[in-house]
Amino acid sequence: MCSPRDFRGNKYSHRVWCYLGKVEYLTTEGRKQVSYWSAKVIDEKTFTANAEVDEIKWVAVTKVRELLSMETDKEILDKFMKIKFDTKPLILLRHAKAITRDEWQGDDDDRPLDTLGENQSKRLLPMYQVYNLSQIHTSDAIRCYNTVQPIARGLNLKLEVTAKLSESTYRKDKDKAFDYAKELLKSEINAMICSHNPILPKMLNKLTKKSDVDADEEKLSPADGWVIHRNGKEIIQIDRLDAPLV
């Protein structure tokens, strides 16, 4: 278990699984907050000591507790030991901030991202590349396509563009987007769906209806996402990732 920044900073290639929680503590520079995920190292590089880390040591889970002094760290360990590993992510991402409907005179599917949305889209790759995505599916609306294009380019993936995930199709047939997502959920594919706010909350509710995991009741803001972690047919956990700070 580790923060993704620590993995990257110490040059470990890794794949992220379930979110474990946050730890806060005081330093000489003020309050510090660290978020933890379970993860798997894919490619271990030679480590060189630096200003933040003197040594990296792999420790068996059964022996970690005796090395921890903070209760909050022990709580993170407890959650780590309870969850299932090797989950497959299905990510539901709302498009980044777009020009408002009042500001746009053309077809709504052609409504582009505004300046904030363009900046958000450029910062999504570091957040989502750790999920080892192999497919990205997007609504054919320009604002969705342009949101995930930088991710696809960074991961060298071809975008799967479909009208089935668009608002215009949803208004005519509300089942098409859900059926599309359901097939991806049943697959063993690490995938992302980029769509719209009227669609994604209902999609999440339907996908998790028969699971033991509660769906998030709060709607997504632009560039927010949900990560559905699944192991076989079982949904293990749903993580919410807020939009990148710009």
Question: Which residues are covered by each model-predicted region?
Answer:
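Active-site-proximal alpha-helix that buttresses catalytic centers in soluble enzyme cores
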Residues: 86-173, 201, 212-224
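Active-site-adjacent beta-strand/loop module that shapes the phosphate/pyrophosphate-binding cleft
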Residues: 23-46
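The catalytic Nudix box helix
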Residues: 1-19, 60
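Active-site-adjacent alpha-helix immediately C-terminal to a catalytic or transition-state-stabilizing loop
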Residues: 176-236
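Generic structural signal for residues in well-ordered beta-strands
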Residues: 16-17, 56, 77, 159
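Short, solvent-exposed aromatic-acidic interface loops
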Residues: 239-246
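NUDIX/MutT-family hydrolases
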Residues: 36-40, 47-82
